[in-house]
């Protein structure tokens, strides 16, 4: 389409290259950037505390405008998965649920699951946890140079950790949508205190985790009091964007905030996870009821929550991460948009990677993009070998 190339693509290219240059110059952590431009520490906290630790500045500061432009499918985000399922089955594909892959053998191009079923493949696209892939891949029958490259990448993958996870509270409220529509929008961030978290979720939390065995339950709960009272909550009310998402006269609400997987893991090992989770829920409800949504607790019909452990258990995501890797100076995957096409490559023959672990920073758009890039590579391989 020469018209598209000359009228759209070529005029757009200089702006794209200029934007890429700006992005690459703003890779430093948002905390460092704000340190230089915002003198009030509480204000710095309120701006940055709902971002993952060391989030690149370009990603963090753009989010304030990007999330306002989000479009949601009618019926909820789950409709995306349903549409994908329907398309796969329409084209003759098969989806195996409740199945865990336990072995990948690139030499023989086979993989096995937890039911001891073996599958042969021509090309494999791994769209799940990358640490898992590098733990279960069997490389003994691969050439020595391939094994050497694989071991170097494997060490890098296993030496890094997933980013922070989230605690998500789901609420069923006996109150019409109009009541909440007078207070807020369908998706917003709310910080009840002007103080900011300070070191509550950084130094204080790390000190607590280092000496968790010596810290009593009461000390942990006192820390939790501060953590919830000073935090920032991401609140979603789907019914305000799609009225069919809630029964007449009722409202569904989703409240999320960043949470540390290791904390929940240590509480679980100490034997009081249910009590801790209930305590988190109660404190969140109290804060919201006392501030932005007066009387919310009195109108509550039901509730349930998802913890970092829940995400790990449901989808085998390392450290319960929801956006892939923790942000480090040396990332284990591609993190520059101009070479994003390389993000799907692995050292394993005929194995490609996609999803939130394949590129950093990640999210739904990059997960979709890496899926398309990996599919293109696999299709090209099939055509080449015909």
PLM feature spans:
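Flavin-binding catalytic cores
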Residues: 176-177, 202-230, 273-313
């Amino acid at each position: 389409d020469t018209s598209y190339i000359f009228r759209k693509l070529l005029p757009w290219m200089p702006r794209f290259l200029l934007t890429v240059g700006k992005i690459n110059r703003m890779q430093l952590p948002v905390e460092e950037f704000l340190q230089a431009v915002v003198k009030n520490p509480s204000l710095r906290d309120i701006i940055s505390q709902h971002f993952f630790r060391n989030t690149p500045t370009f990603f963090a500061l753009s989010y304030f405008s990007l999330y306002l432009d989000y479009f949601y499918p009618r019926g909820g985000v789950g409709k995306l998965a349903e549409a994908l399922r329907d398309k796969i089955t329409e084209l003759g594909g098969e989806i195996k649920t409740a199945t865990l892959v336990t072995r990948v053998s690139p030499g023989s191009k086979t993989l096995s699951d937890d039911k001891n079923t073996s599958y042969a493949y021509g090309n494999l696209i791994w769209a799940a946890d990358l640490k898992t892939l590098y733990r279960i891949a069997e490389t003994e029958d691969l050439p020595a140079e391939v094994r050497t490259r694989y071991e170097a990448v494997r060490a890098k993958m296993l030496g890094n950790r997933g980013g922070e996870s989230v605690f998500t509270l789901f609420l069923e409220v006996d109150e019409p949508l109009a009541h909440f529509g007078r207070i807020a929008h369908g998706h917003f961030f709310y910080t009840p205190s002007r103080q900011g978290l300070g070191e509550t979720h950084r130094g204080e939390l790390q000190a607590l985790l280092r000496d968790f065995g010596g810290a009593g339950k009461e000390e942990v709960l006192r820390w939790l009091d501060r953590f919830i009272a000073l935090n920032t909550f991401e609140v979603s009310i789907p019914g305000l964007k799609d009225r069919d998402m809630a029964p007449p006269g009722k409202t569904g609400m989703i409240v999320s905030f960043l949470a540390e997987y290791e904390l929940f893991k240590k509480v679980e090992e100490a034997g009081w996870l249910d009590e801790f989770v209930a305590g988190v829920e109660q404190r969140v409800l109290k804060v919201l009821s006392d501030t932005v949504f007066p009387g919310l607790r009195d109108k509550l019909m039901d509730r349930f929550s998802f913890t970092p452990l829940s995400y790990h258990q449901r989808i085998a995501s390392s450290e319960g991460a929801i956006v892939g890797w923790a942000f480090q100076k040396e990332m284990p995957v591609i993190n520059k948009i101009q070479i994003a096409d390389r993000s799907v490559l692995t050292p394993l023959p005929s194995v490609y990677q996609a999803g939130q672990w394949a590129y950093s920073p990640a999210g739904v758009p990059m997960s979709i993009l890496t899926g398309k890039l990996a599919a293109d590579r696999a299709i090209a391989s099939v055509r080449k070998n015909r």
